[in-house]
Amino acid sequence: MNKTSLPQIDSLERQWYLVDAENKTLGRLATEVAAVLRGKNNPSFTPHLDTGDFVVVVNAEKIRVSGSKPTQKLYRRHSGRPGGMKTETFEALQDRIPERIVEKAIKGMLPHNALGRQMFRKLKVYKGSEHPHAAQKPQPLQLNPSASAQ
């Protein structure tokens, strides 16, 4: 009987990818980035190990959603105190903290456990086209053409 070989985590070569979110649809971009963070694009993918790569997302303020979502999609957060529920629309959050929209969409597509939190730490989202990870030489990640908003 053959024994399944597992990749050694310390021997994995982690790549850095750069994604430009300008005029991309939020959900379509998030699914592809989440797959790269999980490592689903690697031949050494193992569900219970973090084999994913690093992803840098720039131009988070230029992400798009379809239909009436800019005015109707709500983001909720709670302070933990009685009556501490805060609700904000997509437009308002995009004006205030556009990085949080992309982060929340991608985080919801990762496993909801300690492994998912570890994968989420490899995501870097920035407003504008500048980022501090030039030393890692991130390669542009080719997204599916349907991710671009019409």
Curated annotation (Swiss-Prot):
Region (Disordered): 128-150
Calcium recorded as keyword: no
Polar residues biased stretches: 139-150
GO biological process: one example: translation
GO molecular function: mRNA binding; structural constituent of ribosome
Region forming the signal peptide: none
InterPro entries: Ribosomal_uL13, Ribosomal_uL13_bac-type, Ribosomal_uL13_CS, Ribosomal_uL13_sf
CDD domains named in the record: Ribosomal_L13
UniProt keyword annotations, A-Z: Ribonucleoprotein, Ribosomal protein
GO cellular component, one term: cytosolic large ribosomal subunit
Family membership noted in the UniProt record: Belongs to the universal ribosomal protein uL13 family.
HAMAP family attached to this UniProt entry: Ribosomal_uL13
Record text on subunit structure and interactions: Part of the 50S ribosomal subunit.
NCBIfam families linked to this entry: rplM_bact
PANTHER family, sorted: LARGE RIBOSOMAL SUBUNIT PROTEIN UL13M (PTHR11545:SF2), RIBOSOMAL PROTEIN L13 (PTHR11545)
Name of this protein: Large ribosomal subunit protein uL13
Organism: Parasynechococcus marenigrum (strain WH8102)
Gene name of the encoded protein: rplM
